[in-house]
Amino acid sequence: MNITDVRVRKIAKEGKMRAVVSITIDDEFVVHDIKVIEGEKGLFIAMPSRKSSDGEYRDIAHPINTQTRDKLQKIVLEAYEKAEYVEE
């Protein structure tokens, strides 16, 4: 799996969410709405999710192993650090 494109939209509002990211995998598959969150231990990514009928949030798409999650987080956070704020 190769991440062939990362698009970052930084958020300049108050709160813990810092950006919304879209990634392209192998120039063939796009995942939208990955969030960059500021946590107590630093930045991390949250995969796109949906609120279920019981009020819990469930990931729509996510890596199935730690190695892939770590790789994805590293790539997304590196792109986040390089991105500039865009005024809306």
From Swiss-Prot:
Pfam family, one: SpoVG
Annotated keywords: Cell cycle, Cell division, Septation
Cell division among keywords: yes
InterPro entries, per the entry: SpoVG, SpoVG_sf
Superkingdom assignment: Bacteria
Regions that span the bilayer: none
GO terms classed as biological process: division septum assembly; sporulation resulting in formation of a cellular spore
Cited function: Could be involved in septation.
Similarity comment text for this entry: Belongs to the SpoVG family.
Protein name, as recorded: Putative septation protein SpoVG
Organism encoding this protein: Lachnospira eligens (strain ATCC 27750 / DSM 3376 / VPI C15-48 / C15-B4)
